[in-house]
């Protein structure tokens, strides 16, 4: 599934290709998505390419080919506004309540365990305060919990201050996953996980913040992001 920003960029590129026969420039993409820097566009394009939605053609400037578009159900949901919303795994599909619910859409109570920093790491609160209800098929298998996002270091990934991050408990992660990382058993942060040689990189999605490079013995994975819960 695509994040909202990824979907908006894919739609913008596809519409420009249909209208003009050439893809938009990075500056045009940045302005269309209201991003502050072109580095955010680079990350979005890389994510779209990794997911098989676009292909960058070698040795040609501004050469981007749209290979496929999201399913109609996701495209329609990304265009609607509502309260509250749930954004599915990797922040793609948005669902609203419907008159008839099948088993996968029936709400599941997810405990809210505290706050998580999307910025400078803060202490992760581990006391269950309340629950939020999300459709069962948004979570998948495993044990899940929610953390309230504080900070703006992941805005280019579509994660905003005040969002509820839906987390699947997990002690391992693949490169590129957005994870809850516990640093030195004291501070927790929400960042993109990558391996760099023998080290671990915790990457923000905001150029105002720096990548943190840490040895593995200082980082514990507490879970992987599978979705967002947002009220408008």
Curated annotation (Swiss-Prot):
GO terms for molecular function: DNA binding; serine-type endopeptidase activity. It is an enzyme of class 3 (hydrolase). SUPFAM superfamilies: LexA/Signal peptidase (SSF51306), Winged helix' DNA-binding domain (SSF46785). GO terms for biological process: DNA repair; DNA replication; negative regulation of DNA-templated transcription; proteolysis; SOS response. Residues 26-46 bind DNA. Its EC number is 3.4.21.88. The active site is at residues 153, 191. The keyword Zinc-finger does not apply. Gene3D superfamilies: Umud Fragment, subunit A, Winged helix-like DNA-binding domain superfamily/Winged helix DNA-binding domain. Pfam families: LexA_DNA_bind (PF01726), Peptidase_S24 (PF00717). The keyword Protein biosynthesis does not apply. Keywords: Autocatalytic cleavage, DNA damage, DNA repair, DNA replication, DNA-binding, Hydrolase, Repressor, SOS response, Transcription, Transcription regulation. Belongs to the peptidase S24 family. HAMAP family: LexA. Represses a number of genes involved in the response to DNA damage (SOS response), including recA and lexA. In the presence of single-stranded DNA, RecA interacts with LexA causing an autocatalytic cleavage which disrupts the DNA-binding part of LexA, leading to derepression of the SOS regulon and eventually DNA repair. Homodimer. This is LexA repressor. It comes from Bradyrhizobium sp. (strain BTAi1 / ATCC BAA-1182). The lineage of its organism: Bacteria, Pseudomonadati, Pseudomonadota, Alphaproteobacteria, Hyphomicrobiales. The gene is lexA.
């Amino acid at each position: 599934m695509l994040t909202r920003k990824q979907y908006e960029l894919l739609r913008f590129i596809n519409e420009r290709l249909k209208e003009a026969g050439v893809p938009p420039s990075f500056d045009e993409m940045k302005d269309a998505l209201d991003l502050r820097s072109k580095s955010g566009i680079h990350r979005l394009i890389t994510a779209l390419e990794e997911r098989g939605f676009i292909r960058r053609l070698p040795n040609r400037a501004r050469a981007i080919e749209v290979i496929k578009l999201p399913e109609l159900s996701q495209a329609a949901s990304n265009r609607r506004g509502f309260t509250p919303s749930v954004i599915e795994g990797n922040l793609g599909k948005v669902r609203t309540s419907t008159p008839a619910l099948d088993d996968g859409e029936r709400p599941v109570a997810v405990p809210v365990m505290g706050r998580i920093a999307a910025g400078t790491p803060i202490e992760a609160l581990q006391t269950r305060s309340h629950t939020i209800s999300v459709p069962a098929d948004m979570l998948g298998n495993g044990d899940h919990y929610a953390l309230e996002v504080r900070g703006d270091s992941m805005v280019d990934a579509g994660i905003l201050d005040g969002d509820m991050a839906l987390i699947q408990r997990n002690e391992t992660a693949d490169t590129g996953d957005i994870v809850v990382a516990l640093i030195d058993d004291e501070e927790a942060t929400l960042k993109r996980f990558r391996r760099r040689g023998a080290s671990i990189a915790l990457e923000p999605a905001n150029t105002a913040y720096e990548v943190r490079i840490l040895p593995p013995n200082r980082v514990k994975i507490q879970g992987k992001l599978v979705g967002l819960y947002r009220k408008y």
